[in-house]
Design a protein with these regions (language model features):
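Conserved beta-strand segments that form the floor/walls of ligand-binding pockets within enzyme
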Residues: 1, 28, 125
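His/Asp/Glu-enriched, well-ordered alpha-helical/loop segment
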Residues: 16-99, 114-118
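Conserved beta-strand positions in the central sheet of alpha/beta enzyme cores
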Residues: 1-2, 94
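Short, acidic/turn-prone active-site loops that include or flank metal/cofactor-
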Residues: 3-8, 32-34
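Active-site microenvironment of metallo-dependent hydrolases
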Residues: 69-181
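Short, charged, surface-exposed secondary-structure boundary motifs
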Residues: 9-14, 38-40, 104
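Active-site glycine- and acidic-residue-rich loops that bind
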Residues: 8-11, 75-77
Length: 181
């Protein structure tokens, strides 16, 4: 599983997405970060693949989209995921293409991945059940989740410093964007 945003944050990248793909190596693109904006992940994966290989061939948004959907399903051994067809789980999203920042719409997939973000997702259906509509998840308090997330993040940072094999201080592991006094 390739997580381009996370790997890229520390200067890493996948050697050659097109080469793996052309060699029939399954590449599944995922994310293990918050916020998990998959459109950003797809955009970054596509850019890295094109930069590393020096060509746009084999790293189109369709290629990356297939790595996200079909590649992930194959990695999990789940032929009922990653596609819309008879016998598959009805997992889908609806994206608002009318917002100004989307610009002119030519190819919907390309437009979404070039200009969109997770904030443009208006509907999410998982296994045929609507779980999010109009950006609202029934019974979920996002402010409460955000506050708990900050608490867990702070604990994670402390634990990370304890486990760091170099025993670097927090200011080295979690450098601020600008010096703070």
């Amino acid at each position: 599983i390739y997580c381009p945003v996370i790997i890229g944050r520390s200067g890493g990248y996948l050697d050659s997405f097109p080469e793996y793909r052309n060699s029939s190596v399954n590449v599944a693109i995922g994310t293990d970060t918050f916020p998990p904006d998959f459109f950003q992940n797809i955009r970054v994966a596509s850019m890295y693949a094109k930069m590393v290989s020096g060509t746009a061939e084999g790293a189109s948004y369709a290629d990356i989209y297939n790595a996200v959907t079909l590649g992930g399903a194959q990695y999990l051994g789940r032929p009922d995921l990653g596609r819309l067809c008879k016998g598959a789980k009805a997992d889908l999203i609806a994206v608002d293409l009318d917002s100004f920042h989307m610009g002119a719409v030519d190819d919907p997939i390309r437009t979404i991945f070039l200009c969109g973000s997770g904030a443009d997702v208006k509907l999410s259906v998982i296994n045929g059940r609507t779980v999010m509509k109009d950006q609202q998840i029934e019974g979920v308090d996002l402010e409460e989740i955000k506050a708990k997330g900050q608490i867990y993040y702070n604990k994670m940072k402390l634990g990370y410093m304890e486990r760091d094999y170099q025993h670097l201080p927090a200011e080295k592991l979690f450098r601020p964007s600008f010096p703070m006094r």
